[in-house]
Amino acid sequence: MAVIVKGTIYDGVRGAKVEFGTFTIDPASLNAATEAEETLTLDGVASGDLVFVNPRSLTAGLLAKGARVTAADTIGVTLRNELTTSVNGASVTYDYLVVKFGGDA
């Protein structure tokens, strides 16, 4: 897992900062009808930040269910296997967007 690209946009009126970029995840195998959270380092994220992710593609049966800040500089992406068999997902590039408000902006 690695951050490939990173950019920042500032909103001086509302005091928000938006960071964006890409990262890759090579998820562990998921059993049928289960979900798991993959974590990765994303420098600068903090508790209270909003995280949005969008995979550029996914292995059939996998669903990117959501993302969150799990700790300082760390995000978690929850993947769900919707199939009745296990799935070993391929490495996938994700686009991300982090919104920071107030003092962190």
Across the structure, where does each feature detected by a protein language model lie?
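Short acidic, gly/pro-rich beta-turn/loop elements at beta-sheet edges
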Residues: 50, 63, 87
